[in-house]
Design a protein with these regions (language model features):
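Aromatic-lined carbohydrate-binding surfaces of glycoside hydrolases
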Residues: 92
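TPR/TPR-like (Sel1-like) alpha-helical repeat modules
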Residues: 84-85
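An alpha-helical repeat/solenoid feature that recognizes helix-turn-helix modules
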Residues: 1-79, 95-142
């Protein structure tokens, strides 16, 4: 979706623009994290904040994508934005609630040689916080 949207913007390619819009509709029709018919959380991982996401998905990643393609103010982002705001820590900032990698000096699947700030339910992660503030500002909520 992001690649198609950027390509369409730079080349004015109508087919790519339409494909990006259709892809956005898949996410928006599910409020970025809810089952379209059940209204329940599709996957518990979607409502946890991670950094970095790599090839995975969470609600903040979905919101970032909507901000980048200019769809963050779509009313169907409201529940995801509310969820994000609810995760703000009392002292400010947002936590990385779960890690998708382990720090390692060797080459293994799902490892990284960088520590991206760790995970904690009570301590803000600077990367997650920067992304959350960017999204909320783009949505007119900051």
């Amino acid at each position: 979706m992001l690649g198609l949207a950027i390509y369409a913007e730079r080349t004015e390619n109508v087919a790519a623009r339409d494909a990006a819009r259709r892809a956005a509709e898949v996410f928006l029709s599910r409020n970025l994290f809810l089952g379209r018919h059940s209204g329940r959380v599709m996957n518990k991982e979607f409502v946890l904040l991670h950094y970095p996401l790599y090839y995975s998905y969470d609600v903040l990643g979905g919101l970032k994508a909507m901000a980048e393609i200019g769809r963050i103010r779509d009313p169907r982002c409201r529940k995801a934005l509310d969820l994000l705001e609810s995760k703000r820590l009392p002292a400010g900032g947002w936590p990385a609630e779960q890690r998708l990698y382990r720090v390692s000096s060797g080459v293994e699947a799902r490892t990284d040689s960088v520590d991206w700030g760790g995970t904690s339910k009570t301590t803000p992660n600077e990367w997650v916080t920067a992304d959350a503030l960017h999204v909320l500002k783009a949505a007119g909520r900051a």
